């Protein structure tokens, strides 16, 4: 572990030698009483294996490299619209069928993440009409990114989608139906 003056802390894994860089900013109290929001971010260094990453509070940047990687979203704060998560960025999300593409990634939500949404690890586009009440994907061709948005209670209190995850470097349109057919979104 080492710390530098610019707020970066680097931890080196004893297992694989890959580095994980953390950027931590704390709340600052000033004489005028201003209390800026704290920010906690981390970058996961890429590996060549099938990694499982558990998302935490804060705005995380994830780069996983080769392999079929899974990002898991658990409930950190049941009263929060995004279950306690910030807006994460996955820099190298592999879009494709998990059955045929060894680099296709998976976004997994815990069964408690959504209220009244079926828990099924084998979701497909046949579930689209139910899933799209809780999950929305907006593709932006200008930035080549797809934003995964969530509404944890579906239509219960009206539609109120919140940005959860930005899939960067997506050169073609990414849709919820395709993510479901590719088995890249799972629940449970």
Model region roles, listed by residue range:
Residues 2-45, 104, 129-188:
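Low-complexity acidic/polar repeat-biased segments
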Residues 45-127:
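Acidic, glycine-rich calcium-binding repeat modules characteristic of RTX/beta-roll
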